[in-house]
Amino acid sequence: MKKIVISDIKGAIFDMDGVLLDSMPMWDHAGEMYLAGQGIQAESDLEKVLFTMTMMKGAEYMQEHYGLELSAKEIIDGINETVRDFYANKVEPKSGVPELLRFLKRYDIPVTVATSTDRCHVEAALVRTGLMKYVDRIFTCSEVGVGKAASPKIYEMAAEFMGTPAS
């Protein structure tokens, strides 16, 4: 195994959900959390049911399955509000993340975030958790115009911003 020399590190690109922030459980349970806010107990495997659906199809499923007297758009808006509240008020950094980011900052290593999450949620979470001061730039898939699984573009843009070769 090659020894890492700190002077060899020219930049760092981090995903946000599940890497910097302990947010994956929220994504697994957003529908359940929304229904709980409506006073409804979700079925135990709701996340599996919704996983393969678009937001619209998932909202229509919840509308029909739980007898919600809301439009699919209102349900989507409610789920989005649940997500917004989580990022703005509840999400916490993963263990060791603040220390790692402080270390990188101490050595003037640029840090970027490349995420599928919308900028408003990213900024709210990073500011509240105190991590924003360590991040030099945020790149979101919606702003880049393509998802991370479909293209390396978001990583290439982050590397270019830091003046480092993409590797």
Predicted regions and their residues:
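A short, compositionally biased domain-edge/stem linker segment
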Residues: 1-3
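N-terminal helical cap/lid subdomain that shapes the substrate entry/recognition surface
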Residues: 5-107, 120
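Ser/Thr-centric signal marking residues that sit
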Residues: 19, 23, 115, 140
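Substrate-recognition "cap/lid" segment bordering the active-site pocket of phosphatases
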Residues: 112, 118-167
